[in-house]
Swiss-Prot record:
The keyword Nucleotide-binding applies. Pfam families: CTP_synth_N (PF06418), GATase (PF00117). Belongs to the CTP synthase family. Residues 297-549 form the Glutamine amidotransferase type-1 domain. It comes from Caulobacter sp. (strain K31). CTPSs have evolved a hybrid strategy for distinguishing between UTP and CTP. The overlapping regions of the product feedback inhibitory and substrate sites recognize a common feature in both compounds, the triphosphate moiety. To differentiate isosteric substrate and product pyrimidine rings, an additional pocket far from the expected kinase/ligase catalytic site, specifically recognizes the cytosine and ribose portions of the product inhibitor. Keywords: ATP-binding, Glutamine amidotransferase, Ligase, Magnesium, Metal-binding, Nucleotide-binding, Pyrimidine biosynthesis. This is CTP synthase. Its EC number is 6.3.4.2. It comes from the Bacteria. GO terms for molecular function: ATP binding; CTP synthase activity; glutaminase activity; identical protein binding; metal ion binding.
């Protein structure tokens, strides 16, 4: 029997519902249960694929090609369970489905309304089969996070749907966890419970009585305040769980267990004989985080550095590499535009970095700065890791400054006679521009999800991966033009990874450099704290070695 846990939020956004959901999922896993996490996003966009990184943050891509909320990255990293298209839905998708059904006549002339049609679609999504990763057995728990905060007009159909589900499901098969905020007013020297009381009041006004309150706070909650919250919010004192700020997100499962969150959830379900949790791997990570053997500094040369959430999986993957090497990873965020117009700016800013990371991005803005970062890394022999756009800029840099093709560019930046990088429907064959269409082998213009690649035997990447066959997640419209492969190789930039048909360049590396690798895919999306991605583990190892040399 699958049980359902609904995680809602109140008072303010960005309290960490996704992280709380992931941590609770990890605690249930530690007790031997199978879990799956799902996210309901109330925005009207069909998916976040076209949303600005400054508004939405990272777009997390699943193996089956879904563009989803960054919280699914937390789910995967904490539980190790790969998410799918069936684990994220938006209001836009729901309305799109309903309108298509109405146009087909599926509703037989009925008036289409929020209740029951929208709420039924939401309930159908939540109750859709949730299988373990083998696909053979249903999971024990489905954790469902509702985006936004209680009181948001966009979220009302979702709250109504989960209200109905408590009545639809058998007794003791659902649990409401409400994440809220207990602000500490420094001038008054006291913690305020009123925002939490009002948040729960709003939740109860729409028919939902939370079973557990997870209270974000900067300081410990006094016992009398817990009793006060319990009394006014109609929960047991033991169900008021303290969620203090933590120095590391990977300490959160341990903290929540010590506060009794998982035990309280199991009590709601009447599961009093649940196995004790094995938190040894979380404790090992916490030990490494708090007692590293050293530090490395990675310069991250990006376009969206104002909002760090735009690089959420990348940040975590770099820290996973640090865990693998038992070092603390310090990130120096560099806006790539600062390198444009000043040739010495890159050298001055990157001088103290042990390694350089150039992540993905879209558009011409900041591209020249990323090219200069790649040039600095190549010339100074500093470890360089280029992902997606970062690989493409490394290729352009080599062809401009080593091969002598001074006008090498990308068709993403506008018309060019030297499209070293082109959209996947544009390729140069001889003197002709070849147009590929959606029904050709390469498909459309956006490559999403997991694709296989073949590595060159004996290459650095083959050694790092420990084999020549890999599968990685992609999200891009532009590719390095295979027609320039020979010039790249002549310039020392070896093409050591391709699609199985040999057409699409996937990986480049320099043989005359201690660690210079560019990849077209996004390896950060598959990194886990317990299984750091091999490229990130190797990259941080190279940075650690660089630190010994300088």
């Amino acid at each position: 029997m699958t049980r359902y846990i609904f995680i809602t939020g109140g008072v303010v956004s960005s309290l960490g519902k996704g992280l709380a959901s992931a941590a609770l999922g990890a605690l249930l896993q530690a007790r031997g249960y199978k879990v799956r996490l799902r996210k309901l996003d109330p925005y009207l966009n069909v998916d976040p694929g076209t949303m600005s990184p400054y508004q939405h943050g990272e777009v997390f891509v699943t193996d089956d090609g879904a563009e989803t909320d960054l919280d699914l990255g937390h789910y995967e990293r904490f539980t190790g369970v790969s998410a799918t298209k069936a684990d994220n839905i938006t209001t836009g998708q729901i309305y799109k489905t309903i309108i298509e059904k109405e146009r087909r006549g599926d509703y037989l002339g009925a008036t289409v309304q929020v209740i029951p049609h929208v709420t039924n679609e939401i309930k159908d999504f939540i109750l859709s089969p949730a299988m373990d990763e083998t696909g053979a057995k249903p999971v024990d728990f489905v954790l469902v996070e509702i985006g936004g905060t209680v009181g948001d007009i966009e979220g009302l159909p979702f709250f109504e749907a989960i209200r109905q589900l408590r009545q639809d499901l058998p007794r003791n098969q659902s649990c409401y966890v409400h994440l809220t905020l207990l602000p500490f007013i420094k001038t008054a020297g006291e913690m305020k419970t009123k925002p939490t009381q009002h948040s729960v009041k709003e939740l109860r006004s729409i028919g939902i009585q939370p079973d557990i309150l997870l209270c974000r706070c900067e300081q410990e909650i006094p016992v009398e305040e817990k009793r006060k919250i319990a009394q006014f919010c109609n929960v047991r004192p033991s169900a008021v769980i303290q969620a203090m700020d933590s120095s590391s997100i990977y300490a959160v499962p341990i903290d929540y267990h010590q506060e009794g969150l998982d035990a309280e959830v199991l009590d709601v379900f009447g599961m009093h004989d649940a196995p004790k949790p094995d938190l040894s791997r979380w404790e090992a990570i916490d030990q490494t985080v708090n007692h590293p053997d050293g530090e490395v500094t990675i310069a991250v040369v990006g376009k969206y550095t104002v909002l760090k959430d735009a690089y959420k999986s990348l940040i975590e993957a770099l820290h996973h590499g640090g865990l693998a090497n038992k070092v603390k990873v310090n990130l120096d965020w560099v806006e790539s535009e600062t390198f444009e117009g000043d040739e010495g700016a890159a050298a001055a800013r990157l001088e103290n970095a042990h390694a350089i990371m150039v992540p993905g991005g879209f558009g011409e803005r900041g591209a020249e700065g990323k090219i200069r970062a790649a040039q600095f890394a190549r010339e100074r022999k500093v470890p360089y890791f280029g992902i997606c756009f970062g690989m493409q800029m490394a290729v352009i840099e080599t062809l401009r400054n080593v091969a002598g093709i001074k006008d090498a560019s990308s068709s993403e930046f506008g018309p060019t006679e030297r499209p070293v990088v082109g959209i996947m429907t544009e390729w140069i064959k001889g003197n002709e521009t070849v147009q590929r269409r959606a029904n050709d082998d390469l498909g459309g213009t956006m490559r999403l999800g997991a694709y296989d690649a073949v590595l060159t035997p004996g290459s650095k990447v083959a050694q790092i991966y420990g084999g020549t066959a890999i599968s990685e997640r992609h999200r891009h419209r532009y590719e390095v033009n295979i027609g320039y492969a020979h010039r790249m190789e002549e310039s020392g930039l070896k093409l050591t990874g391709r699609s199985p048909d040999g057409v699409l360049p996937e990986i480049v590396e320099r043989e005359d450099h201690p660690w210079f690798i560019g990849v077209q895919y996004h390896p950060e999306l598959k990194s886990r704290p317990f299984a750091p991605h091999p490229l990130f583990a190797s990259f941080i190892a190279a940075a650690k070695e660089q630190g010994r040399l300088v």
